[in-house]
């Protein structure tokens, strides 16, 4: 599930489409060594300098992998209490586009129904000591999410940010504001 990411040294894994506690348990298990999980144990991987890091140090540090589960639809919200109860879940990340689609309002990520579901996730996660992340496609939506209690914002994408900066520069060249 996330073996390559961990073996190259990723400090966190982000697993999409988690809709149940069973899927959450499988994700956590894949990210952790025994006895907390089922991740294969080998210290001769890139993240351990191919054996250059003492085994005890490597295994201790690698066991601290941050596990981020993506809750991307109404089914995940319906099962959220069970998902949040899985030991080892650090962050639940909301996919607002998928959530909007599951609610029948595809693409409307700031629709009150979507924002209400995100607020429910924040409230339930806070009660379980789990942080919440969410994607924002504008500074305004990012600010609103922070105000709601979301702590981790996945902002836009590199190409959109670059395109918007280029458009602003082109407008400035033409004396437009």
Description of each model-found segment:
Residues 142-159:
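Short, electropositive alpha-helical surface patch
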Residues 94-110:
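Glycine-rich, proline-tolerant flexible connector loops at the mouths of alpha/beta enzymes
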Residues 1-3:
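Short, small-residue-biased leader/transition segments that mark boundaries at the very start
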